[in-house]
């Protein structure tokens, strides 16, 4: 598994960005092959982070490009700065997702 963390700073309206990411962008990510998970975090103080997991690095790179395009086309006034991206092979997982 390959995981990508995108950290956006200077977000103007985090609540709106999170809502739109879940409603509009998440379905696009979910439709990509090899997709096991997508999380959006409102970290406060104008910081929003997303965590995306894929079965392969290629799928993650494709998702990164799709994310950049979606932000530029849909919320450029709310997310004025490019994200700091951290990505790599997932070396350990423990998850318990409530229903």
Put a short name on every predicted segment.
Residues 1-49, 55-69, 76-99:
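Short S/T/G/P-rich N-terminal loop/turn motif that feeds into the first structured element of a domain
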């Amino acid at each position: 598994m390959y995981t990508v963390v995108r950290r956006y700073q200077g977000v103007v309206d985090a609540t709106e960005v999170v809502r739109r990411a879940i409603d509009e962008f998440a379905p696009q990510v979910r439709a990509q092959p090899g997709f096991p998970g997508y999380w959006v975090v409102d970290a406060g103080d104008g910081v929003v982070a997303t965590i995306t997991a894929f079965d392969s690095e290629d799928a993650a790179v494709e998702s990164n490009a799709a994310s950049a395009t979606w932000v530029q086309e849909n919320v450029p006034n709310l997310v004025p700065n490019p994200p700091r991206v951290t990505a790599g092979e997932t070396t350990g997982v423990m998850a318990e997702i409530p229903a």
